[in-house]
Amino acid sequence: MAELQLDPAMAGLGGGGGSGVGDGGGPVRGPPSPRPAGPTPRGHGRPAAAVAQPLEPGPGPPERAGGGGAARWVRLNVGGTYFVTTRQTLGREPKSFLCRLCCQEDPELDSDKDETGAYLIDRDPTYFGPILNYLRHGKLIITKELAEEGVLEEAEFYNIASLVRLVKERIRDNENRTSQGPVKHVYRVLQCQEEELTQMVSTMSDGWKFEQLISIGSSYNYGNEDQAEFLCVVSRELNNSTNGIVIEPSEKAKILQERGSRM
């Protein structure tokens, strides 16, 4: 009897395990049908399940150029008005309230922050502008709408000693000018001839200033030549009285008065 060779590809025909015919006519079980080798064609079948691997921590976001990034900037909420400046500006007065609050983070100055992260300061924002500008460029700039006393009050609150001295000096100077009152002048009218005019103007001193020269024609006739006459108006500040004591005019002032009496 010839030996029957079973093709493995034919195994599995005829149902569940696949049966064939053996030497004695009994069923012969072949090996299970192998799966086709090679990658699964696109669009057919399911991809293999990926195995989850733990993620390693990666680098954080890059810092801003300049080294400090956003940490250099400070946001202040002064009486509902926002001001933005740098920690370097606030640190120019190390003993000030602002430096201790924002730069040194003094635990004794426990200040709340709003929803934007700005420091809450319950002061008048109108007078905070001159304070912040002084820390920026070191100059005191007060507009006409602001009172110097108000700036002084804020400078004392923020404990900026140099600004306190500067505002006090300005207030003192303004008080001195107000106490002196408006500047008054004394006027003199001198009559002179043309040949005397140059000498009189050149020798004028002691605070006297030339104001106006008026020609009044010729009053004298020497032969065929007319001598022109002029009125010379001079003035000086009236500041020769102190505490009721009248200071006598100098000799040159007396000469000017005598010449003026010729009119």
Curated annotation (Swiss-Prot):
The organism's place on the tree of life at top rank: Eukaryota
TM regions (residue ranges): none
GO annotations of cellular component type: Cul3-RING ubiquitin ligase complex; cytoplasm
UniProt protein name: BTB/POZ domain-containing protein KCTD2
Disulfide feature: none
Record bears the keyword Flavoprotein: no
GO MF annotation terms: cullin family protein binding; protein-containing complex binding
Coiled-coil positions: none
Sites of Phosphoserine modification: S33
Biased composition (Gly residues): 12-28
KW Acetylation (keyword) present: yes
GO biological process: proteasome-mediated ubiquitin-dependent protein catabolic process; protein homooligomerization
Record key words, sorted: Acetylation, Phosphoprotein
PANTHER family cross-referenced by the UniProt entry: BTB_POZ DOMAIN-CONTAINING PROTEIN KCTD2 (PTHR14958:SF22), POTASSIUM CHANNEL TETRAMERISATION DOMAIN CONTAINING PROTEIN (PTHR14958)
Modified residues (N-acetylalanine): A2
Pro residues composition bias: residue spans: 29-39
BTB domain boundaries: 72-172
Record field: compositional bias (Low complexity): 1-11
Residue numbers spanned by region Disordered: 1-69
Pfam family, one: BTB_2
